């Protein structure tokens, strides 16, 4: 493996950024901690730019703005593996996510190496090297980081940099275009935020609520999100989903009644109980109630519509020479049915359409989907 440099000064970072602007592509990864916070804590940034591999230490108080500006440069191409949570970190610190990204997990899937291939499996396939994963659960905020932690972090971009051109060469021009489009789609999705007033539409057990309870649930979801962000604690630390559902259905009116709610912590009642009760009152006072929601799989016509969409997915996968799961998962099919049958028109103007309606999927499937929904319901 290449020798690596741990960057702990602004001068070192500026010098690296200048070098990185003149290479064909960067291999990028991040290490972070998110066990007890809403916002992830960035612990390390690993980058390989040609023959230079650096570990950027954000914990020591570096000015990272030159690096973020580097990543925003449309002439800088970025290679990343399974970048989902990395994109959230970048959005949090940069205010945006770079769009010129090639995700090697997506590339490997389109090259026929299986869906959701992990980094260790990717390295094993291309180099026959076993990557040490013993540090995957380490605390990246602690200092100093041990040599084995630094070696582990460096390996995440060392091999990725060399694998990228080999993987890219396996893809036809059409598949390369699809990989780039899918990478861009995944980046865009991580940057989206559902407006608070529509969060209840995507709450798994919302169908158990009547219309009045849905109005309360709508307010409760906004309360929980606001509390989590302001206190920088995970959503589940404020209130778990089953607790929100119980609150919405029982609609407690007093602090004493809050104490009878399953798993609602005394800390939440003490410091946020008044705001919680206010949210419930606001939901109860709503004059325009949400439409009743049914469990999707129980709705009339669900099964034939699901199967008809699945047939189109299978046909498209065969046409493209990829696995059906790369076109759409069961959840993505359900997202389309949910969108058509349960998302109000008013909400659709505020929300991004399901995956099957956008990008390369939409170009191939949208006409077929429209025909299915006109025919089967």
Stretches found by the model and what they are:
Residues 37-41, 55-58:
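Short, glycine/acidic-enriched capping/hinge loops at junctions between secondary-structure elements
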Residues 39-40, 90-92, 165:
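Short amphipathic alpha-helical segments
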Residues 147, 167-377:
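Accessory DNA-binding and partner-docking regions appended to nucleic-acid-acting proteins
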Residues 31-33, 263-264:
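Short beta-turn/strand-loop junction motif enriched in small, turn-promoting residues
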Residues 1-26, 30:
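N-terminal accessory regions of nucleic-acid-interacting proteins
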Residues 4-6, 46, 51-66, 70-161, ...:
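Active-site-proximal helix-loop-helix substrate-binding element of RNase H-like nuclease domains
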Residues 27, 36, 43-47:
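Non-catalytic, usually N-terminal nucleic-acid engagement modules in DNA/RNA processing proteins
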């Amino acid at each position: 493996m290449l020798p690596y440099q741990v960057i702990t000064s602004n001068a070192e970072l500026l010098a690296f950024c200048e070098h990185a602007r003149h290479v064909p592509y960067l291999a990028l990864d991040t290490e972070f901690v998110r066990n007890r916070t809403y916002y992830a804590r960035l612990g390390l940034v690993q980058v390989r730019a040609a023959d230079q591999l650096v570990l950027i230490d954000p914990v020591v108080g570096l000015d990272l703005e030159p690096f973020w500006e580097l990543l925003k440069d449309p002439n800088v191409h970025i290679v990343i593996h399974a970048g989902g949570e990395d994109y959230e970190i970048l959005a949090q610190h940069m205010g945006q996510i770079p769009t010129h990204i090639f995700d090697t997990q997506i590339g490997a899937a389109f090259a026929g190496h299986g869906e959701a291939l992990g980094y260790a499996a990717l390295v094993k396939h291309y180099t026959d090297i076993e990557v040490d994963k013993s540090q995957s659960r380490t605390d990246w905020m602690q200092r100093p980081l041990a040599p084995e932690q630094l070696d582990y972090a460096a390996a995440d971009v060392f091999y990725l940099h060399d694998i990228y051109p080999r993987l890219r060469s396996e893809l036809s021009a059409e598949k390369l275009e699809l990989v780039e489009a899918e990478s861009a789609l995944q980046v865009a999705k991580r940057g989206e935020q559902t407006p608070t007033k529509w969060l209840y539409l995507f709450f798994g057990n919302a169908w158990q609520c009547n219309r009045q309870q849905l109005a309360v649930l709508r307010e409760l979801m906004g309360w929980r999100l606001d509390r989590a962000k302001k206190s920088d604690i995970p959503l589940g630390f404020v209130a778990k989903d089953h607790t929100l559902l119980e609150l919405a259905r029982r609609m407690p009116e007093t602090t004493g009644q809050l104490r009878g709610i399953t798993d609602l912590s005394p800390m939440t009642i003490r410091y946020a109980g008044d705001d919680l009760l206010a949210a419930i009152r606001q939901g109860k006072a709503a004059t325009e109630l949400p439409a009743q929601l049914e469990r999707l799989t129980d709705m009339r016509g669900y099964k034939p519509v699901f199967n008809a969409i699945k047939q189109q997915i299978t046909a498209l996968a065969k046409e493209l020479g990829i696995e059906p799961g790369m076109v759409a998962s069961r959840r993505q099919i359900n997202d389309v049915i949910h969108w058509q049958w349960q998302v109000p028109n008013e909400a659709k103007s505020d929300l991004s359409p399901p995956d099957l309606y956008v990008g390369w999927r939409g170009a191939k499937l949208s006409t077929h989907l429209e025909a299915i929904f006109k025919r089967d319901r």
